[in-house]
Amino acid sequence: METMGTLRRTNYCGEVSLANAGQEMTVCGSIARARDKGGIIFADLRDTTGILQLVFDEDTPKDVFAKAESLKSEYVVICRGKLRERAAKTDKIATGDVELYVSELRILSEAQTTPFELRDEINVNDDLRLRYRYLDLRRPSMHEPIVLRSKIMQIIRNYFCENHFCEIETPTLIKSTPEGARDYLVPSRVQPGHFYALPQSPQLYKQILMLSGFDRYFQIARCFRDEDLRADRQPEFTQVDEEMSFVSEDDIMTINEGLIKRLWKEMLNIDVQTPFVRMPWDEAMGRFGSDKPDTRFGLEIQDVTEVFKGTEFKPFAAVLEAGGTIRAINAKGLADKLSRKNIDKLGEVAKTYGAKGLAYSRLTADGTSSSFEKFLTDAEKTALYAALNAETGDVLLLVSDTDWVKACTALGQVRLDIARKHGLIDPDKFNFLWVVDFPLFEYSEQEGRWMAMHHPFTLPKAEDLDKVESDPGACHAVAYDIVLNGVEMGGGSMRINDPALQDRMFHALGFTEEKARESFGFLMDAYKFGAPPHGGMAYGLDRMVMLMLKKDSIRDVIAFPKVQNAGEPMSGAPDVVDAQQLKDLNIALTMKD
């Protein structure tokens, strides 16, 4: 192997063009592949910007040509030469009009044969890719999202700074508090028996910053949650966090619509239309069966309860007698595609989300096949068809339940399943909206008490202030989520800045005065010295980048992601530690068999 000597990079591989033809330049990187054509050698040199073809021929110095003959994939080199127009141009790479005729070559590092080919068109086991993540990240399809993620972060920083925000880091070792997911705990060596928690979000500290007079704060923060992994979750993730004083929810939404507009324009050259639609939570659940509705397609849910008032169809009658509801969707024109077998599968989807079953009617040219219509009167059939604008070729799908949210949620998932399987979603659309007016509380059967739907510091709607303790289920929050194509991209709320109201919230959530002070005493004390009205929100950066780049998983936009068991295959984390480390921390392990 050689050193770089006096050679230093003058150009990046992916940034040269015909405008540079005739120039002497020095480039460096890894050999993507080399081809010896007998008397002429071609090699594709890859760096972080792209690929440039190198050429070695009869005019190349003999010692350089000899080195070129030894080149193999992933050898790391630096070379100097003259850029020329390429005779056989290609549009497969951005630099397909030019090639570099090499006059000087230094091989800086050799490479073993890789366990898989480093090109985009491969079918490789995910475990192998993650074990050799440093190789996987060399592939352009994996490398580019990480580079674009960096650019996105820079745009975010620039935007916030232009709008008078101050970037402030909050602590990573903090006090563990209730009302969230499970904390990652860090034992203190100097205070035996005491533990820090890794932050699930900077929530308390950013509110304290508003009480500290900073007015507008942002941070690209690392956050940690010890929860089971799903396709869109990681135990450690990056959050774009913000907070503002002396604002309303309208001000916060306007600032964030500006951020989205800037990002989509600079990164994707797409003009996003603002302001976004604002949809109350009740409407989102009622029309789409989701608090993060995908509005790129129809199949909206409709309330057909009135159609069946007085019905003798026993399943519906029992639900209505108990004060329940009947909801439906019309899968228009899909009767030929939704067979009985397909509908049975949709029924399983509905049951997975709490429905007791899925009633259906297929309206075909050969007649109607239905699981319930024979029990209906002609008037009920006519009213149902009119309510759903039903005609030949349609499929009507109904769910009944005493809980309208459960009925809509089940149909919402059926709606998504149909759309995904039958090509109803335009992948090129970016449909943004705000979901607003969330419930302030949700009841936990497991805990046997009311829980904060967002967190205990969320401001109730003004008209609900008197109900916080007397009727928690009727209260709504000054809270808002930004939704893109059926995915919650971020969310936030206005915060409570009245100590007396905060005490009432803690009481409604079942906190004793002692427990509230133990967990949040420092925030409650800060309120005593004057607290401006404030609010904010946060985005999951990983999810935002995934949506912008149309990736299937957030793992594709994270350099070193965790897997399903929260492990990191490349390094082997988490790992056991030696006995002395545990002794220093005053920790003894008890392992279950």
For the regions a language model picked out, list residue spans one by one.
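Class II aminoacyl-tRNA synthetase catalytic cores and aaRS-like
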Residues: 1-593
